[in-house]
């Protein structure tokens, strides 16, 4: 009996060793596949960044920010009018889109929550988050540009705001839901009105996260080209009149990159590098703000 028991124990131990060895082998395979996938993604990202920096650094100069876009096949020039136009479009899109997104997020997190209107709003918001930007551009073209019978900066502002609103809504709702309900209950116990509780407690506690979402939304719309092709278009002149077509970086880069002129192509690469740096800085700033909030 003792011999049989010893054999059974030895067989059991051998079976366990085989299972553990197979588990370790599967773990190694999964780790290798994960590392390979990560390196594959990093390879393309580094390649894109390297190409952008090496080809765009030559065009980075003071003239890029002080001179207007040049005529075809002309040396010199810059992107001053396109930079100013993009800044104006992003500014007004943020001014319009941010309050709408924050107010909608407050309703979803504090008032609606499980109501049918909140569910419908979340569903539509999810569709807008995943919708291609060109669809938004065509929509604004149909309801604004076609009705006005001309392109305009305001049409571009509306298109960019529509792209920004869903991000701000989602971020605001998620950040407000992270605030403990005990804080709300304590405020209600003191007789605080709901609007006062929201403004003084929940919004104050989640302001860093909401600000992070706003910065990420700005980074999202900063490089959008498709909506602006159908709305604000572009021009070669210095203009701040949003009732007319206005120069902007994404469309200018697209036009210059597709041209056969080397001078325009160099300016296009410089514009790409400028947008890349701006988006990178916005993402870093958003992460810093969110990290401070966590600590």
From Swiss-Prot:
Question: Residue ranges of the ABC transmembrane type-1 domain?
Answer: 83-286
Stretches that traverse the bilayer: 29-49, 88-108, 126-146, 149-169, 198-218, 266-286
InterPro entries with a match to the protein in the record: MetI-like, MetI-like_sf, Phosphate_PstA, Phosphate_transprt_permease
Query: In what way does this protein cross or attach to the membrane?
Result: Multi-pass membrane protein
Q: Which Pfam families match?
A: BPD_transp_1
Q: Which GO terms describe its biological process?
A: phosphate ion transmembrane transport
- Protein purpose: Part of a binding-protein-dependent transport system for phosphate; probably responsible for the translocation of the substrate across the membrane.
Similarity field: Belongs to the binding-protein-dependent transport system permease family. CysTW subfamily.
Name of protein: Phosphate transport system permease protein PstA
Organism of origin is Yersinia pestis
Its ancestry begins with:
Bacteria, Pseudomonadati, Pseudomonadota, Gammaproteobacteria, Enterobacterales
């Amino acid at each position: 009996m003792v011999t049989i028991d010893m054999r059974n124990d030895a067989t059991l131990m051998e079976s366990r060793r085989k299972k553990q060895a197979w588990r370790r082998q599967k773990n190694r395979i999964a780790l290798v596949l994960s590392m390979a996938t990560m390196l594959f993604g990093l390879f393309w990202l580094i390649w894109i960044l390297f190409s952008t920096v090496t080809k765009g650094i030559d065009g980075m100069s003071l003239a890029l920010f002080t001179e207007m876009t040049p005529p075809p096949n002309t040396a010199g020039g810059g992107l001053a009018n396109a930079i100013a136009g993009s800044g104006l479009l992003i500014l007004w899109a943020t001014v319009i889109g941010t309050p709408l997104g924050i107010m909608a997020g407050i309703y979803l997190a504090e008032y609606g929550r499980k109501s049918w209107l909140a569910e419908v709003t979340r569903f539509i918001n999810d569709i807008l988050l995943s919708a291609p930007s060109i669809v938004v551009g065509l929509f604004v073209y149909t309801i604004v540009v076609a009705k006005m019978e001309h392109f305009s900066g305001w049409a571009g502002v509306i298109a960019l705001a529509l792209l920004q609103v869903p991000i701000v809504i989602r971020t605001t709702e998620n950040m407000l839901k992270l605030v403990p309900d005990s804080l709300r209950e304590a405020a209600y116990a003191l007789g605080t009105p709901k609007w006062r509780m929201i403004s003084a407690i929940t919004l104050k506690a989640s302001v860093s996260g909401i600000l992070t979402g706003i910065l990420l939304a700005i980074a999202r719309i900063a490089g959008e080209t498709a909506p602006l092709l159908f709305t604000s278009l572009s021009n070669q002149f210095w203009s701040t009149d949003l009732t007319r077509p206005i120069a902007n970086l994404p469309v200018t880069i697209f036009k210059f990159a597709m041209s056969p002129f080397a001078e325009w192509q160099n300016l296009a690469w410089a514009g790409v590098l400028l947008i890349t740096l701006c988006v990178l800085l916005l993402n870093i700033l958003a992460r810093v703000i969110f990290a401070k909030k966590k600590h």
